[in-house]
Amino acid sequence: MRLAIFGASGATGRHLLQLSLDAGHTVTVLLRSADSVSIRHPALTAVVGQFDQLATVASVVQGADAVISVLGARKGGAQTICSDAMRSIMLAMQAKGVRRLIALSAYGAAESRDASWFIRFVRMVIADRMRDKDAMEALVHSSGTDWTLVRPPALTNGEASGRYRSGTGLRPGITARLPRADLAAFILHTAESGAFIGQAPVVFT
């Protein structure tokens, strides 16, 4: 497959990028600087640019079988990165005729905001980030693409377990966690299999 990945330099993105290349896929990524990722591979094309450069974003998605966004707000960084970037990604996909879109959201976004008292509390603590996820999900729903929104609970840097649960009717508890390595594996499998189109699966261990 030809994959376009946004957020490849992040904690989840690095796992996803390595897994994608190991699986034999051709990958194009958008980076703020050329040294944002240390991976070098003949099947990897790194494009340097910003999300407000629509022609650059379009060059990343051109010819892609699937576009994957694993963007997330960083401490001290822009708290609207997910929704701002998604606007550019959607315009680029429309311009290049690319339909498959997988975007990393969060359990507790959109209609899952009232899943439990704990989720409501989390939304209060990280209100700006969750509003960004809400806005991104609304954009994706209106995109006209073959979309999937992935909703993990709290993420960890633990090793991949390969034993995660996923589905649209799941309600993870307070202690639910997910290693970023497992999240990356789930996202790649979703891209490869074409599963969960038009759905927002929850995934956790």
Predicted regions and their residues:
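Conserved Rossmann-fold cofactor-binding substructure of NAD(P)-dependent oxidoreductases
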Residues: T45-D65
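N-terminal Rossmann NAD(P)H-binding glycine-rich loop of SDR-like oxidoreductase domains
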Residues: L3-A23
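NAD(P)-cofactor binding segment of oxidoreductase domains
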Residues: R74-L101, R131-A135
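Conserved beta-loop-beta element that borders a ligand/cofactor-binding pocket
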Residues: E137-E159
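Glycine/proline-rich active-site loop of Rossmann-fold NAD(P)-dependent oxidoreductases
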Residues: E159-Y164, T190-G198
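Substrate-positioning beta->alpha
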Residues: I81-C82, D132, V150, L178-L188
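SDR active-site strand-loop-helix element
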Residues: F6, L30, I68-L71, L101-Y107, ...
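N-terminal Rossmann-fold cofactor-binding loop
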Residues: L30-D35, Q50-F51
